[in-house]
Every structure is written in structure tokens, then in C-alpha cells.
Regions:
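Conserved G/P- and acidic residue-centered "switch" motifs that form tight phosphate/ATP-binding loops
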Residues: 130, 135
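Conserved SAM/SAH-binding loop-helix junction
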Residues: 66, 136, 140
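Conserved acidic residues
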Residues: 55, 123, 153
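PRPP-dependent phosphoribosyltransferase catalytic core
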Residues: 3-5, 139-200
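Active-site-facing substrate-recognition patch
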Residues: 1-54
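Conserved PRPP/pyrophosphate-binding segment of the phosphoribosyltransferase/PRPP-pathway fold
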Residues: 39-105
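Residue-level preference for short coil/turn positions at secondary-structure junctions
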Residues: 53, 76, 120-122, 166
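Short, glycine/charge-rich flexible loops or terminal/linker lids adjacent to PRPP-binding catalytic cores
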Residues: 78-125, 190-193, 197-198
Length: 200
């Protein structure tokens, strides 16, 4: 399997390059089971968050759960929120929004219980994700926060994939390119001529 060496938070991980379409491949960044990476990324994201004024952290199920838990642990936060991919029997009167993700086929939904929504109401929420790519999941979380009556204080991720690195409304630790079928890095719209040559 082709891999890509990802340098982030002072560590290096070889990401498997996985097929999305015939000529569009992505590097699979998985934090599950990697305690060292999770701790390091949480530490560095909290450094980026120091200038932000927020009350709570929120992420979407599931890959970012270890990350947001570690961020809460390191910062001493007693509460954070997880937008779930399905309603649970213990969720009173849940609210929901649609979510489209590059790594998930079709349309899915994100849910918050009314109890969590009531805590978010009137509060400033920092949205956290492992990877921001098309921005579909990010937009869904923003909509969920607004639906609960909160405001988005900031948006951050470990990696910004593809053109997401050009967004000026997110904070991230490192850019992650996308790839062609042969493993070469795809050309970004804003690459310099020197960068293009290095990828050929």
C-alpha cells in the first residue's frame, strides 16, 4: 500500500493512501489507538486555542472523540459535547442536522440531546475535528450549534486537507495534500511553479 509521511505535532506518521474515486485519493489520518499522537495534537491545538474565547468544545462522532477528550483533560474542562451520528434512547427531544463527509457515503445526520443543546444555548463553542476537507462536517456542526442557540467561537483541526488549507476561518496544525491514483500529490490551485515541479 502507498503511504504518505505526515509530520504533525512533532511526530511523523505514515498515512495509507486510500481511494475515493478513480483519480482522487486521500491520506487516511486515524488517531484511534495512537495515544502519543492524540496527546501531542491535543497539546498543540490548545496552544492555538489560547487566543480564542470559548466556553465549551464540540466535535462530531467518531474519529475526533479521543482528541477532544484529551483536549478537555489537558485544559481542565469538565464538559465537552459530541454530536452523535444517530439518536440515542437516552437523548431527550434531540435536535439534528444533515452532514456530508468525504469519507462517508451518502448523507448522514448529527444529533444532540436537548439537555446538551440547553447547555450550549447562549454559550461560545469551539468546534474541533481531526481533519477538515470539504467542510461538510464542519458546516453541519456550525448549524447544530446555531440550532441549539449557541455561537461558534472558532474552528480547528489537526489537519486541513486539500484546498481547506486556504481557508482563513480555521486553525490547523498542518496541511494534508490529496493524491492521484499513482500516489503523487495532486496540484493545489495556489501551488507555486516550484511546488508543482517537486510533485511531478
Amino acid at each position: 500500500m502507498m503511504t504518505y509521511p505526515m509530520h504533525v505535532a512533532g511526530l511523523v506518521r505514515d498515512l495509507p493512501i486510500c481511494k475515493v474515486t478513480e483519480d482522487f485519493y486521500i491520506g487516511a489520518f486515524i488517531m484511534f489507538g495512537d495515544a502519543e499522537l492524540t496527546v501531542a495534537c491535543a497539546r498543540d491545538l490548545l496552544k492555538l486555542a489560547e487566543e480564542l474565547d470559548y466556553d465549551y468544545l464540540l466535535t462530531a462522532e467518531a474519529k475526533s472523540i479521543p482528541l477532544i477528550h484529551e483536549m478537555a483533560r489537558q485544559s481542565g474542562a469538565e464538559k465537552y459535547f459530541i454530536a452523535r451520528k444517530g439518536p440515542k434512547v437516552y437523548m431527550p427531544d434531540p435536535i439534528s442536522v444533515e452532514d456530508r463527509s468525504i469519507t462517508t457515503l451518502g448523507v448522514q445526520q448529527l444529533f444532540l440531546g436537548r439537555d446538551d443543546a440547553d447547555l450550549i444555548k447562549g454559550k461560545k463553542i469551539l468546534i474541533v475535528d481531526d481533519v477538515i476537507s470539504t467542510g461538510g462536517s464542519l458546516h453541519a456542526m456550525e448549524t447544530l450549534v446555531a440550532k441549539a442557540g449557541g455561537t461558534v467561537a472558532g474552528r480547528m483541526a489537526v489537519l486541513a486537507e486539500g484546498d481547506a488549507k486556504n481557508r482563513d476561518d480555521i486553525k490547523f496544525l498542518a496541511p494534508l495534500p490529496t493524491f492521484k491514483a499513482d500516489g503523487r500529490v495532486r496540484r493545489a490551485h495556489n501551488q507555486t511553479e516550484q511546488e508543482r515541479r517537486s510533485n511531478e
